[in-house]
């Protein structure tokens, strides 16, 4: 939709990967719609995933005992966070939709993306106490996980060896994104592209492109435990 701003947080080492193809088609389709699309290519940026004292450029509020959450909250208020953090926060703040494109690592995100979440979504910027879930500081924004897996779709069912895929979405979609106030759109799951045929992979890319054509008309998922753990 013309005038909308989209941030794609991309976490894959190889530009020619299937994840890279999904990222590229998202950029192309959303740009075609007139959206302004920004990509944070975390590996290409050599993004620092570790949460350390270096994230605070000013004086610590308690130099005797370091508490990362407390210190980054204070640093956010004092405008003394490291520039790589504030650069990403500005991108998030300007975005109407944030898409996270990544391969599933151990039922979660790659370490570099976890580090992005740990460092960028700090108290004062993404949430406060009070000021979380429906009152999160990023309310009014949309978020979407676009994930590739190593396992097949059958493996991620209630009766499959891995269990229902929605179980693994709970800490990411609910405990992180919804906690920060995002309205979460249904995830885009591309199952087992490594073992899929070329035709099947093309179908996955086409399905993602087609979905993006009407992405602004989608309703967010219900932010309830039942959506994830329904019986």
UniProtKB/Swiss-Prot annotation:
Recorded catalytic activity of this chain's protein: 1-(beta-D-ribofuranosyl)-1,4-dihydronicotinamide + a quinone + H(+) = beta-nicotinamide D-riboside + a quinol
Positions with a binding annotation for FAD: 12, 18-21, 104-107, 148-151, 156, 194, 201
Pfam families xref list: Flavodoxin_2 (PF02525)
Single GO MF descriptor: dihydronicotinamide riboside quinone reductase activity
Intracellular or extracellular location(s): Cytoplasm
Note on how the cofactor is bound: Binds 1 zinc ion per subunit.
Keywords in alphabetical order: Cytoplasm, FAD, Flavoprotein, Metal-binding, Oxidoreductase, Phosphoprotein, Zinc
Signal peptide: none
Family (UniProt): Belongs to the NAD(P)H dehydrogenase (quinone) family.
Subunit structure: Homodimer.
Role summary: The enzyme apparently serves as a quinone reductase in connection with conjugation reactions of hydroquinones involved in detoxification pathways as well as in biosynthetic processes such as the vitamin K-dependent gamma-carboxylation of glutamate residues in prothrombin synthesis.
Official protein name in the record: Ribosyldihydronicotinamide dehydrogenase [quinone]
Source organism of the structure: Pongo abelii (Sumatran orangutan)
């Amino acid at each position: 939709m013309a005038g909308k701003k989209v941030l794609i947080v991309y976490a894959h080492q190889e530009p020619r990967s299937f994840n890279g193809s999904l990222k590229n088609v998202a950029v192309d389709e959303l740009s075609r719609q007139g959206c302004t699309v920004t990509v944070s290519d975390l590996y290409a940026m050599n993004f620092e995933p570790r949460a350390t004292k270096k994230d605070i450029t000013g004086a610590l509020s308690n130099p005797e005992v370091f508490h990362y959450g407390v210190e980054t909250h204070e640093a956010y208020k004092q405008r003394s966070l490291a520039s790589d953090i504030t650069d990403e926060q500005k991108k998030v703040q300007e975005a109407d939709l944030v898409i996270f494109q990544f391969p599933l690592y151990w039922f979660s995100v790659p370490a570099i993306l976890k580090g992005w979440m740990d460092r960028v979504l700090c108290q004062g910027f993404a949430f406060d106490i009070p000021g979380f879930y429906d009152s999160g500081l990023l309310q009014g924004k949309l978020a979407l996980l676009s994930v590739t897996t190593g396992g097949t779709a059958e493996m991620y069912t209630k009766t499959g060896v891995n269990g229902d895929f929605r179980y693994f979405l709970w800490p990411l979609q609910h405990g992180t994104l919804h906690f920060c106030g995002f309205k979460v759109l249904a995830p885009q799951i591309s199952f087992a592209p490594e073992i899929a045929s070329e035709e099947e992979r093309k179908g996955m890319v086409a399905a993602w492109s087609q979905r993006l054509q009407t992405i602004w008309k989608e309703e967010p998922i219900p932010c309830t435990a039942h959506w994830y753990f329904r019986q």
